[in-house]
Amino acid sequence: MTYRAAQNLIKRGDEPALRAALDTGLDPNLVNQNGWTLLMLAAVEGNLPIARLLLEKGANPALCNNKEETALTLATHRGFAQFAEILA
């Protein structure tokens, strides 16, 4: 599965399809050309269930994008303070 396809699942909030992709080999730390991880996408969408799923499957919350932002930084800047509980 490509980053773009995974991104679409996250934007749609399609947790079952994302889980199936992760179960069949999708890397939970997949990044795009800007260094954005799937966890970062979930964070900016404010989607806690998908963020929890990605963490459960091995997503690394400490990874930074090309601007040195983490998923926690991105979520906090968008007002999703509840992400601090699962990402810190």
Residue ranges of model-derived segments:
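Conserved ankyrin/ankyrin-like repeat signature
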Residues: 17, 49-50, 82-83
